[in-house]
Amino acid sequence: SSNPKSLEAVFGVRCYGSADAAAAARDRAFFFAAEGRNTGRVSSVGDRPTSLCLVKPHAMAAGYAGLVLDQVMGKFHVTALEMFNLDRANATEFYEVYKGVTPEYNAMVEELISSPFLAIEVADPDGGNPVEGLRALCGPADPEIARVLRGGSLRAQFGQDKVKNGVHCTDLPEDGSLECEFFFSILCS
């Protein structure tokens, strides 16, 4: 496609689209349905610990979503996946824990509301808490530091600066389920 914002341009040949609405319903049920219950939540991990990775808008626009997803899927089970386009109120609520803590807070909110981004919920394949492992995959929040200390990390590869650092990931083990619930339960309801 000649459109730089088309799915093919953004995701390359690693993108599948259901043929019609009925096929989309079958595909969604196959990949995400919780057997025996209908909670309205896309994920079906139950009580397993989860963590959140966001492919930030600038990384989406640069066409990195598929590359990030490949690396995430190489280490974790992807239990939910959704595109979001947040308004300021929801972005402010999500990043509230950083207000007054990081000088980049306002710029982080602006980046998150600038255009669509991809939210990825992950679980550890061995059943452990995936937060630390995902943080290691993402690397330090500052891509310059990431390139020195963790050259293969997502932020080293796809980040530009502290705000446009490629990805957001859950910081604390106790926050993984809360961040995932915010996107995949609250915002999806």
Question: Model segments located where?
Answer:
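Non-catalytic terminal and connector segments of soluble metabolic enzymes
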Residues: S1-S189
